[in-house]
């Protein structure tokens, strides 16, 4: 299980701790990942995803998982999220 968000691709970054004396030591900045269950209205199913807190706020802001995935750039999504996006697009095409 990698330390990256399945929806936004946000991952581990590296940097420095900087002391008062300006000494620099290497450190990692980890994303705030949460295991959440999101519901797809189009598919009528629940999906368990590992997403960052920022991505969770973005999903809520866009109006749900379906709207987020349809608007998201496919290159940033994980393989699971890409498959989910394709299923939603297919289901929307059938309904139209």
Curated annotation (Swiss-Prot):
GO terms for biological process: translation. The keyword Ribonucleoprotein applies. HAMAP family: Ribosomal_bL28. The gene is rpmB. InterPro entries: Ribosomal_bL28 (IPR026569), Ribosomal_bL28/bL31-like_sf (IPR034704), Ribosomal_bL28_bact-type (IPR001383), Ribosomal_bL28_sf (IPR037147). GO terms for molecular function: structural constituent of ribosome. Belongs to the bacterial ribosomal protein bL28 family. This is Large ribosomal subunit protein bL28. NCBIfam families: L28. It holds the Pfam family Ribosomal_L28.
């Amino acid at each position: 299980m990698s330390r990256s968000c399945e929806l936004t691709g946000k991952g581990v970054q590296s940097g420095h701790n900087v002391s008062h004396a300006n000494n620099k030591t290497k450190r990692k900045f980890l994303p705030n990942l949460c295991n959440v269950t999101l519901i797809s209205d189009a598919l009528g199913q629940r999906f368990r995803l590992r997403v960052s807190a920022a991505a969770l706020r973005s999903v809520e802001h866009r109006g749900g998982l379906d709207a987020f995935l349809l608007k998201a750039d496919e290159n940033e999504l994980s393989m699971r999220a890409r498959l989910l996006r394709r299923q939603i697009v297919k289901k929307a095409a059938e309904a139209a």
